[in-house]
Amino acid sequence: MESIIALFQGMGIMHITLGQVIMIIVSLILLWLAIARRFEPLLLLPIGFGGLLSNIPEAGLAMTALDHLLHYAHTEQLTIIAEKVNSSSLDVHTIKQAIAFAPPSVQNELEVIASDLGYNAGILALFYKVAIGYGVAPLIIFMGVGAMTDFGPLLANPRTLLLGAAAQFGIFTTVLGALGLNWLGIIDFSLPQAAAIGIIGGADGPTAIYLASKLAPELLGAIAVAAYSYMALVPLIQPPIMKALTTEQERKIRMVQLRTVSAREKIVFPIVLLLLVALLLPDAAPLLGMFCFGNLMRASGVVERLNETAQNALINIVTIFLGLSVGAKLVADKFLQPQTLGILLLGIVAFAIGTASGVIMAKIMNAFSKHKINPLIGSAGVSAVPMAARVSNKIGLEADKQNFLLMHAMGPNVAGVISSAIAAGIMLKYISTMI
């Protein structure tokens, strides 16, 4: 009889909390968006499934060895942990707060102690540690994106680099917005958290995940979900802003035919770009370095096997682990916070400002330029490649059925990828000197 009672007590459903129920529903919504609505399915599907796995009661798939120790809360073991973090209380919540403020070296020591006491990390926690904790997955994905990117439109019309840079204005205004919410006492955001949220405005998922893992890992789940959800909604978010900021006549502007870019230019550009940016801003070197390496494999034409692997098999494999790793952060105690609502609101504001900034910059450039730029391509400065460029082309065709803007829009679109990586480097450098 006792064994039957123990069996029932060991059932996950006997331990499920309201927070876990809510997060399971959120995860199911993400799966529905990925499968039924085709919203960024390559990321939202593994993220949603990872969220399901993370919230299964008593499974502990997303828990580290230390999390498991605190969950079972044996008094003698809690005493050891409390001494290490100088906590006079054996209350688990108090100890968790002390651990959160402990230096990384102490946190690592506590993980080792938990492992020595016989606790093991769950599979999703291991995925997270390697894929995101060490920054491996976002960087490999950036390499794959580089292998898929053609710098030709940007090199053929270099001034579109300004449009990509202007679209990053949404990042920095959103940082100020997050700090403003903190100053007003509405939602608490630290400077590193504000910077991690702001990068959502770059519409670049890997960059957002990379920066969040460095500056605000506790917000990574919400930031990743917001970034990829809004990237999927680009065709809905951008058109109203583009139409509101342009006239019918401006949308009909036809741009001059792009020149042919030589193979030599395409080979030299990623090397020069990396050297110029990395020597001035070393913190941008990891992201930009992998991006330029991937692009050099494509442009050189001598490593087709590597190029093919980077932009297909490798990026697909890493995307699976990245999505599951992000899902590991969709646990109730981390996701169901007032900050999550603030992140979702600030994220869409960042997208809107980035879109508007690119369009406005194009209009400003037209005031001083002989060869006019169609302002619609300015919205492609956000680095949702190639979705933002397709939206620019679609709105242009609505105004003039013979006005094809896709290749012109790819210039600022690629520039946006470069600019978001540079913006992330600036954030890392600036904040590392502040804290």
Swiss-Prot record:
It comes from the Bacteria. Its EC number is 7.2.4.2. The chain crosses the membrane at residues 13-35, 42-64, 123-145, 165-187, 215-237, 267-289, 309-328, 340-362, 404-426. Keywords: Cell membrane, Ion transport, Membrane, Sodium, Sodium transport, Translocase, Transmembrane, Transmembrane helix, Transport. The keyword Transferase does not apply. One of its GO terms (cellular component) is plasma membrane. Pfam families: OAD_beta. One of its GO terms (biological process) is sodium ion transport. It catalyses: oxaloacetate + 2 Na(+)(in) + H(+) = pyruvate + 2 Na(+)(out) + CO2. Coiled coil: none annotated. It is a multi-pass membrane protein. It is found in: Cell membrane. The keyword Membrane applies. Its cofactor is Na(+). Heterotrimer of an alpha, a beta and a gamma subunit. Belongs to the GcdB/MmdB/OadB family. Catalyzes the decarboxylation of oxaloacetate coupled to Na(+) translocation. This is Oxaloacetate decarboxylase beta chain. It comes from Haemophilus ducreyi (strain 35000HP / ATCC 700724). The gene is oadB.
